[in-house]
Amino acid sequence: MNQRRENYVSDPSAYPDRSADWYEYFDRKRREEIIEIIDSHPEIIDEHERNPFGYRNHPSPHLQRVHNYFRMQPTFGKYYIYTEREWSSYRIAEIREFGKLPVLTDDSFATEEEAMHAVFLKRIEDVRNELSQAEQREIAN
C-alpha cells in the first residue's frame, strides 16, 4: 500500500478493456503455430484420417495440439456432424447464433468417421483462410 493516491484508478470507464485486442493477437499467434505444425508434420492428416475418434491410439503430440486449438474456439461458427440417416448418411453443419438454424453443407458421408475427418480438414482450411485474410488486412493498412 505504498502507492500514492493519484496512481489509483478513479474512473474505470476511462480505461478500456484491452482483453479483446490481446485475444486477437494471441489467437493469431496460435493459428500461425497450428499451421506451422500442420505444414511441418503433414503425417498428422493421415493419422487423423485413420483414427478420427482418437480411441484406437492416443494421438501424437502434434495432432493433440491441433485438437486442443480447435476445441478452444468459440462455439458459434464451429462445425458438427449432422446425422441425416442413422448409420448411413452424415453431413457437416455449422453452428449459428442462438435462434438461427444451422447451415448444412452439400457433402454427404457414408460413415461418421469420414464426416469427422472432413470437419478436421474444413477447420484447417478455415485457419489458413483466416490467416490469409489477416495478412491482406495488414497489407491494406
UniProtKB/Swiss-Prot annotation:
Protein name as it appears in the record: N,N-dimethylformamidase alpha subunit
Role of this protein: Hydrolyzes N,N-dimethylformamide, and to a lesser extent N,N-dimethylacetamide and N,N-diethylacetamide. Has no activity against the substituted amides N-methylformamide, N-ethylformamide, N-ethylformamide and N-methylacetamide or the unsubstituted amides formamide, nicotinamide, acetoamide, benzamide, acetamide and acrylamide.
The keyword Hydrolase is annotated on this UniProt entry: yes
Gene name as annotated: dmfA1
Binding partners and assembly: Heterotetramer of two DmfA1 (alpha) and two DmfA2 (beta) subunits.
Record-level Gene Ontology MF annotations: N,N-dimethylformamidase activity
Annotated catalysed reactions: N,N-dimethylformamide + H2O = dimethylamine + formate
Keyword Hydrolase attached: yes
Upregulating conditions: By N,N-dimethylformamide.
Enzyme Commission (EC) number: 3.5.1.56
Keywords assigned by UniProt, alphabetized: Hydrolase, Plasmid
